[in-house]
Curated annotation (Swiss-Prot):
It catalyses: alpha-D-glucose 6-phosphate = beta-D-glucose 6-phosphate. Signal peptide: none annotated. Belongs to the glucose-6-phosphate 1-epimerase family. Substrate binds at residues 71, 93, 193. This is Putative glucose-6-phosphate 1-epimerase. It comes from Haemophilus influenzae (strain ATCC 51907 / DSM 11121 / KW20 / Rd).
Length: 271
């Protein structure tokens, strides 16, 4: 991958080019945050400085090419979810966002990115706040109601040693288009693409291989989406990539976002 330094914004924050994509890169405030591609919008890799492993996952074969959704981090599915229109999961995850504001101190970092229409009208904003936790907030500014999902890819040690806690015992299985009863806590042993009702705004990913728990606190979500492609061939991923990742998405699918409404998730690490 070709990487070029474009601009130094502060001693801690740099704008670099990874192949086709401009990427703000940050290291400070208790978090090592390697990439914020201005496309998607996706925080690619990050972890508290005292963490032994990254919290977020990025595909080792990610090409950082225009027109392709980034396979990893937190791409934004917006203004629609799924394949109801093309491209699947909306246009926001394949468009360039603008870094509009940044604040950096010893104990806190705040970055804001905005998405504009062809007429230079703001459509959406993403803010990322890093303290000892990571707080991601998406705000919808479009005139029409919209769906949205924070498609978070979590880095795990071994998919066979993961337990997802706090999910309901029923879900909509997108693979067979049926409502199903499922166990909770949930273990992953096959291709999973399930939409859950957001009955409990807190989930935990128990990662036994890395001996840690990733805690999620969702705000203003109506659904969660649990996804792992297993052996299914997936663009932007290696054949074994599924073994090291799990997506648990904070979503507004059936209850649409109205102008000015936000959707957010707080991510923290235990262990």
């Amino acid at each position: 991958m070709k990487t070029t330094l474009l601009k130094t914004l502060t001693p801690e924050l740099h704008l670099v080019q990874h192949n086709d994509i401009p990427v703000p890169s940050l290291k400070t405030c208790g978090w090592n945050t390697k990439n914020f591609p201005c496309k998607g919008h996706s925080l690619s890799v990050g972890x508290p400085q005292n963490a032994k492993q990254d919290v977020l996952w990025l595909s080792e074969v990610e090409p950082f090419k225009n027109g392709n959704a980034i396979r990893g981090g937190v791409p934004i599915c917006y203004p629609w979810f799924g394949g109801v229109k093309q491209p699947a999961h909306g246009t926001a995850r394949i468009r360039l966002w603008q870094l509009s504001h940044y604040y950096i101190s010893v104990h806190k970092v705040r970055l804001e990115f905005e998405l504009f229409s062809d007429l230079n009208i703001i459509e959406a904003k993403v803010s990322m706040v890093f303290t000892d936790k990571c707080h991601l907030t998406f705000t919808h500014y479009g005139e029409e109601s919209a769906q949205a999902a924070l498609h978070t890819y979590f880095n795990i040690g071994d998919i066979n040693q993961v337990e997802v806690q706090g999910l309901p015992e029923t879900c909509f299985n997108s693979l067979n288009q049926q409502q199903e009863n499922v166990p909770s806590p949930r273990h992953i042993s096959e291709n999973v693409d399930c939409i859950y009702s957001a009955e409990n705004m807190q989930n935990q990913i128990l990662d036994k291989s890395f001996n840690r728990t990733i805690a999620l606190h969702h705000h203003n979500a109506s659904q969660f989406v649990l996804w792992n492609p297993w052996h299914k061939k997936t663009s932007g991923m290696s054949e074994t990539g599924y073994q090291k990742m799990l997506c648990l998405e904070t979503a507004r699918i059936h209850h649409l976002l109205e102008f000015g409404e936000s959707l957010s998730v707080e991510i923290s690490l235990k262990g």
